[in-house]
Amino acid sequence: MRRQPAKVAALLLGLLLECTEAKKHCWYFEGLYPTYYICRSYEDCCGSRCCVRALSIQRLWYFWFLLMMGVLFCCGAGFFIRRRMYPPPLIEEPAFNVSYTRQPPNPGPGAQQPGPPYYTDPGGPGMNPVGNSMAMAFQVPPNSPQGSVACPPPPAYCNTPPPPYEQVVKAK
């Protein structure tokens, strides 16, 4: 008596497993009569037999995702290590010598400095850059090729402040 409930339980468990597992029911004609067969969930019906798809690994999207992430990580790490171990050579640039002449100290407020006047300060024409730090930054040394070229002075309106807004509006 005890064996019978165990057999019934095993039979029910087997039926439950068979029903829950997704299977494909296939059939084909042999002569005039159909012949039935069952394939597993990952198999397809192929004529008179079951066959496995060659590209069934495409269903494993997480496998391909992890594989591509691993390849990208390895390539990035290899590139980083290669750049650290073998840094690119520095480009050799030609030597660029910068030389400048120091201006003599300012002798006094009324004394004129020797050399051409500089027109960088809007305070007025003929102002020397000794007291003007902005003009000193853009000063051309006298022995450079640009210093020997004679340039005409800028127009007079460059050294005057702009007219007031009201005057410009009334003129139009």
UniProtKB/Swiss-Prot annotation:
It comes from Homo sapiens (Human). Interacts with WWOX (via WW domain). This is WW domain binding protein VOPP1. Residues 1-22 form the signal peptide. The lineage of its organism: Eukaryota, Metazoa, Chordata, Craniata, Vertebrata. Increases the transcriptional activity of NFKB1 by facilitating its nuclear translocation, DNA-binding and associated apoptotic response, when overexpressed. May sequester WWOX in lysosomal vesicles and thereby regulate WWOX role as tumor suppressor. Changing Y119A: Does not affect binding to WWOX. The gene is VOPP1. It is found in: Cytoplasmic vesicle membrane; Late endosome membrane; Lysosome membrane. It comes from the Eukaryota.
